[in-house]
């Protein structure tokens, strides 16, 4: 019987995929197809929630099949992320206008990312205090116990590592290993490796311009191929969003969410407030924040459903260049740095809120100014090297909690609402990187304001 029901669910999913394909054949815009997929995915997931239990075998098996589309799409994006970072960063160095302001551009982008992460930590602290979020009374079930075991294993490798050692881990000892994403800090290690190649290119360009020009032409060819691969993968975005949203909604435990409702509410209030701060920073830079919101919404939608900052990177770069008018070099830097440095959601708000929740359980007053200032500083510093894939928030939280000498068990106790909160965190991460790129480009006079201010006519070109 279960097999029949699973077959029906999968058949409905395939019909919905067929509808999206029909819309594509009728040249319906990319935005409309993505939003249609988002809405239909939520509706389908809610229907499955109503008919079955989230933990039922039918839902579990159906979600496994849905994952072929949703998770398969995310894996394709993750497949291209490391090559894209490597080629994008090196390509940024080969742009003449970038080499003149290299230190200023990279410093400004990183500075904005770290600053906004510190602000995000303060927002998370305020939300925790305002909603009186506490770890008291949280119960540990089977899922939490299993998660706690994994967290403790991961903590063992982090606990004995000092802050200088953590910073040393950012340096790539084997760049080819890091290109596989084998370490939590692999992303930023690839960024550093690519930056060294770029700096070497600048030196070669001064002494041996012919060899440098040959390298540049080869790199341009590789970059064109990588971006073509990105385009091919991005065509699948509506289908991926449909499956991911249906899977997430269908598998969500409503009862568990209600038990941690205060934490979920406080988290989303903090995320929304921080997103508004992004818009305020854009407005203070002399740009229309509504225009920004309209142009990046499809990217944020995908980040929300996929829960992968790294997976959203191709869309991130494309949106910065084609929609916001950000120069290619700055867009490449901002997107690449943004998946490993200063993630406002995963490395900012989340660790700060967990620290505020657990501090009273060990006799610490979380509202003491000294504790708050120390926590903000630790969060900002610890935001270096957080992976832009699943588990990055856990890694950031473990570093912050261990540095503050706080219990790490809280990380496991909120597992039931982790997927729900992670969607919002990821969207904020991506918004933070695009905000850093936009503000940097504006301040350095490299923003094409005509592109930024014009109506969004290029949306469909992302998947063309």
UniProtKB/Swiss-Prot annotation:
Molecular function (Gene Ontology), one example: L-cystine transmembrane transporter activity
Keywords linked to the UniProt accession: Amino-acid transport, Membrane, Transmembrane, Transmembrane helix, Transport
GO cellular component, one term: plasma membrane
UniProt main location, coarse: membrane
InterPro entries per UniProt: Na-dicarboxylate_symporter, Na:dicarbo_symporter_sf
PANTHER family cross-referenced by the UniProt entry: L-CYSTINE TRANSPORTER TCYP (PTHR42865:SF5), PROTON/GLUTAMATE-ASPARTATE SYMPORTER (PTHR42865)
Similarity section: Belongs to the dicarboxylate/amino acid:cation symporter (DAACS) (TC 2.A.23) family.
The protein's name: L-cystine uptake protein TcyP
Organism of origin: Bacillus cereus (strain ATCC 14579 / DSM 31 / CCUG 7414 / JCM 2152 / NBRC 15305 / NCIMB 9373 / NCTC 2599 / NRRL B-3711)
Phylogenetic classification of the source organism: Bacteria, Bacillati, Bacillota, Bacilli, Bacillales
